[in-house]
Regions:
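Short, glycine-/polar-rich solvent-exposed loops and beta-turns at beta-strand/coil boundaries
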Residues: 43-46
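Residues forming well-ordered secondary-structure scaffolds
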Residues: 10, 21-25, 41, 82, ...
């Protein structure tokens, strides 16, 4: 059962674009490939595990634990911690074991790339680097990653608000390509129109390319 989930920019939850398609999220994709004789893991079971299991037990990196725990019981709190890539899943595994497997492998990948030193070199924590790279993924049409990375670093430096539509949409059920003034004014943990600095968590799974763009914009 191949979980070829993950492209950079994948999100945990499904995204409904107003008047358009649904972009299926990681939870839905896992549910789909976990089916065994008609038994599938439910998306809700995966969400419950993500929201309620100690992130350290799921294999989350040490440098992300504080930020994850601050989000309380939000099933989106592990956003960005499943790295893009191809995974082979055992359909007999429980929801907890599947998430643990995916997150543990991703943590290993992130740590093997020296993410802590790389983040430090540009004045960010590893978690902030992941978060910034996720913005690069969601904001950069057609991979203009460097441009967005420069904007992020310049605005954080100023400091001025990032004001990215992707961070407004991340808090909404139904996504509009152009965000409304009302949505921009609403305080959420992610909305960079209404808050200073970066969102509280990544808003997608960042690819290696997006992370590299943050390092060398």
């Amino acid at each position: 059962h191949n979980l070829d989930v993950l492209q950079g920019g994948a999100t945990l939850e499904d995204v409904k674009v107003v008047g358009g398609d649904v972009r299926y999220g990681i939870y839905s994709l896992i549910s789909e490939v976990s089916c065994n004789d008609g038994n599938c893991l439910k998306k809700e079971d995966l969400e419950k595990v993500a929201a309620e299991t100690d992130p350290a037990e799921l294999g989350a990196p040490e440098w992300a634990l504080d930020a994850i725990n601050k989000r309380g019981n939000d099933p989106k709190r592990i956003e960005g911690l499943i790295a893009p890539g191809q995974y082979v899943l055992d359909p007999n595994m429980e929801a907890k074991d599947i998430l643990k497997d995916l997150i543990t492998r991703s943590t290993k990948r992130y740590n093997e790339t020296n993410i802590e030193e790389r983040a430090q070199a540009i004045g960010l924590s590893p978690y902030e680097l992941l978060t910034s790279a996720s913005l690069v993924e969601r904001e950069a049409p057609a991979g203009e990653f460097d441009k967005v990375a420069r904007v992020i670093l310049n605005r954080l430096d100023e400091p001025m608000r990032l004001e990215f539509d992707s961070t407004v949409n991340y808090g909404l059920e139904d996504v509009e390509l152009a965000t409304t003034d009302e949505a921009r004014g609403e305080k959420t943990p992610w909305n960079t129109y209404a808050k200073e600095g970066l969102p509280d968590t990544p808003i997608a799974s960042p690819s290696d390319d997006a992370i590299k763009a943050m390092e060398q914009p």
